[in-house]
Amino acid sequence: MTRHQPIVLVSPAMGIGSRYYQSLAGAFKARGWAARALTRRGFELGAPRASRGQDWSYDDEIEDMAVAVAAARSEVPGRPVIILGHSLGAQIAAGHQLNRVPADGVVTVGGALPYHRDYPWGGLPILLMGSVIVPVLTGVFGYLPAPAFGGPGARTLMREWGRMAVTGKMPFPAAARVRSPSLLISLDGDRLAPEIAVEAFGKRLFAPESVTHWLYRHADVPDGASNHHIYWARSPAPVVDRIVGWWTAQAAVTPAGGAAAGEPGPAS
């Protein structure tokens, strides 16, 4: 694929700032890869929080990701860029790959669409959140205040999230499918992104030939580690090992030079 080891750009989950992923970035660096966490609007130290006067959308977050991917490419030409999207970050990663110059590869962890029909028992809590709680609170306050799920959340982004929960309509164009190599990781017992919802996410947005699935089972969790939807990133060695192995296998079957910027990556 290339003589350069990749750089991993971590796109945080909803309500989590980049500082949470220091252990994850460190685990990649210990394996000889570069890695850094991208900022999450509204959740960085010293940055503006969502409010009636501070608003943004999925497309704004996607554009932030596009700027970060371009910057990573310019730093070391020819180095593969992999986006690792965690939860909400996975949705943004898919939107980026479909609507901007794509990264060379995508990894999602606990990534699913919040469409209630993709969840067990009809996803009633998600349906309630999307149809009632988000519209009412954003209408009253001009944003989604804490302690509501994802709060403080930007009005436009959370309303887009809510519409997706109710109707399944994506907050970005999705006529095509992601064709860059993609590793979709499910977390055993994850109630926020159960395996069935992760699989539906893959079917809706990713070309089948591009996707590799992995379920991080309870039995595979080392002592002192976790495969919880959030806490896996504090003890990320099993996830990082899986990603490195997956990408190494991709490199073994991809012609030298890899995919050019803006072109779909190789099938997996």
Identify the residue ranges that each predicted region occupies.
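Active-site glycine-rich loops that stabilize anionic/oxyanionic intermediates
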Residues: 13-16
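Alpha/beta-hydrolase active-site loop
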Residues: 54-73
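Gly/Ala-rich beta-loop-alpha elbow adjacent to hydrolase catalytic centers
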Residues: 84-89, 93
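Active-site nucleophile loop of the alpha/beta-hydrolase fold
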Residues: 107-116
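Short beta-strand/loop motif that positions the catalytic acidic residue
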Residues: 178, 184-186, 190
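Short alpha-helix in the alpha/beta-hydrolase fold that links the catalytic acid
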Residues: 194-204
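Catalytic active-site module of serine/aspartate enzymes centered on a nucleophile-bearing elbow/loop
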Residues: 217-268
